[in-house]
Amino acid sequence: MALNGIQIFKLTPKKNCKECGCPTCMAFSMKVAQGAMQIEQCPHMSDEALASLSEATAPPMKTIKIGTGDAEFTLGGETVLFRHEKTFVSKPRYAVSLCTCMDDAEVDAKLAAIPHVDYDRIGERMHVELVYVNCSADADAAKYTALVEKAKGLGRTLVLGCTDPEIAKAALEVCKDGKPVLNGANASNYEAMNAVATEAGVVLGVSGKDLNELYDTVAALEKLGNKNLVLDTTGADIKETFANTVMVRRAALKDQDRTFGYPSIVNLVKLAKGDHHLQAALASVFTMKYGSIIVMEQMTYAEALPLFGLRQNVYTDPQKPMKVEPGIYPLNGADENSLVVTTVDFALTYFVVSGELERSGVPLNLVINDAGGLSVLTSWAAGKFSSTSISEYIKTEVEPKVKCRKLVIPGKVAVLKGDLEAKLPGWEIIVGPREAVQLVKFLKDMQA
């Protein structure tokens, strides 16, 4: 059961030293109880108090790390069932599935296709992060290890779908340094699989024929000292899988049952084998409803664009606007004599506009104003993107650095042109297009 602020306060040193950033120990205790701060941020907390508080104040869902280096990812650590209650913290990761039942040509084709989906959206890299390597019932250790080694060459974090401890041990010998997930523990083999995963130092995936068996198996693994787990909630059909995934998350977060407080794997290949359209639809469902690792047969651009866009929208903090730093961004080799274009600091606006400006090839200085992370029309309506804010920023930040006196403003705020001309004497105010897609033609026409 989570502690409240008063219970935490009783164990604090009560110095009111402010070194944690809070004015009093009571304020610090309240923030710890709300999950806004960690108990370790108090520099004067005794070891005994830390030991008693750390477990009680930890998130009900454990944070699990997989992979290494650039391919390291964090799963779990969630504290709320719904994004609007606070925020989601660990986005789901998508995996493309390989299997020993495939021939070499099919495996090679899949491995060659995975790197093709790799692009940036609003400053975030969108790519297939994981490869799920499944061991079919008729495969031996040599065949499975060869497939794992081939998949490892792609440089993505691996998830090993294998229930045979000896085969799993052999496969881990070639990939354990990359910190993969070993997804294969169940009620009949969990002791042996636990030994293999613990020896290799990797995360262990656990499954069960139903939630009761899954719960008992996880509890048994915890008794063995292993809390580095993920739960495979894939059931016999879509309905059961959805129910399993939601009930596991609700048990952990609402009922505070830490036995189910682990990230989830959802294997869509088992639910809709060969139906790529249905898999994409289900991936969107489990992106919103609690899948931590989502396994699919493929990830093409047609599937990636909506899925990654959905994931990015759901897994942003609703309490913080998506914004970029205000400043001057030279594009296409711009210098002090290059044209000045201005817009707001809303991240989506910035990346769309800057992308079109770069595509034009015209050297220019993109000036980003502090508009509170709002879009052009919203910030204008709120008074955050006004002739006053723009002119003051131009005078203080731009005029000392840029000699060009031509300023392009968004077409949607053309009404600001007159005021800006009055407040920025010596500047030529040019009304740009209303849509970013029109910028390339607009800039080329200006140069003509």
Name what the model sees in each region:
Residues 34, 82, 92-412, 418-420, ...:
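Conserved mixed alpha/beta catalytic, RNA-binding, or beta-rich assembly cores of soluble enzyme
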Residues 44-49, 176-177:
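Terminal amphipathic helices with adjacent charged low-complexity linkers/tails
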Residues 5, 22-26, 417:
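Alpha-helix initiation and N-capping motif
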